[in-house]
Amino acid sequence: MTSPIPTPTKFDDKFGSISKSYKNFRPTYNDELYSIIDSHCDEKRDLAIDIGAGSGQATVRLAKYFKKVIGFEPSQGQIENAEKTDNVEYRLSAAEKIDLPSGSVDLITVAQAAHWFNLPVFYEESKRLLRENGSLIIWSYGLMKITNNNDAQVVHEKHYYETIGDQYWAPERKYIDDEYVDIKPSFENTTRKTISLPKSMSINDMIGYYSSWSGYAAFIKAGNKDVLPEIKETLLKAYKTTDGDSKLIDVNFPVYMILSKKE
């Protein structure tokens, strides 16, 4: 994918129409990721904010570590389907202008969303929001690999690169395909880490995950025939079953983390 990456000028809701699929089928993050976040933050933990919170998969996990967590998300559909817990709230907001006082935030997280932002503006807003020694932690998971069935992996790659491909993936997807190397927060104290996120899912869950892709939503919006029933049949054959819940697909997601601290 070699399309130039534009600077977003207005919010284009790519996930509102698929917010339920996003909540139900997107991977949740493992304990290793939150342990890294925990280790990167200092002892002052009054307020964490999760920007581009989506349906709150990461937002609610931060509640264990901080007195209060606010998820900021520009899609009303995502907020309506967001995970709830006592010390978490959600607010409708773009990433580039957050209605909080300067120096009031201990941690800013961005999970699987920074590639949609106007990054130079977001970096400056992050600096404004964070207190001294506050942390900005950004991460994204890349294209998963199916590890227990080569035929299924071929189907998976064909769906990503050919059926959806450049014509339906937004240009911003290139940030993820390039392992977030072009996400460069303007903080001097910045490190990078890549971890693995292994998962097992049923064939039905895999089809649900495909339905949560923004590229799939664009594919359907363009008037194309839904290919997911055909992909399901191909996966059933690959795993030699007729039951979409009887066999597990083992997958691994690479997770690219960027850890910054305001000095």
Curated annotation (Swiss-Prot):
EC number: 2.1.1.-
Single GO term (MF): S-adenosylmethionine-dependent methyltransferase activity
Principal EC category: transferase
Inducers of expression: Up-regulated by Pseudomonas aeruginosa, PAO1 strain and PA14 strain infection. Up-regulated in gcsA null cells devoid of glutathione.
Keywords for this protein: Methyltransferase, S-adenosyl-L-methionine, Transferase
GO annotation terms (biological process): methylation
InterPro entries, per database record: Diverse_substrate_MTase, Methyltransf_11, SAM-dependent_MTases_sf
Any one GO cellular component localisation term in the record: phagocytic vesicle
Record's keyword annotation contains Transferase: yes
Entries under SUPFAM superfamilies matching the protein: S-adenosyl-L-methionine-dependent methyltransferases
Family membership: Belongs to the methyltransferase superfamily.
Name of the protein described by the UniProt record: Putative methyltransferase DDB_G0268948
Species assigned in the record: Dictyostelium discoideum
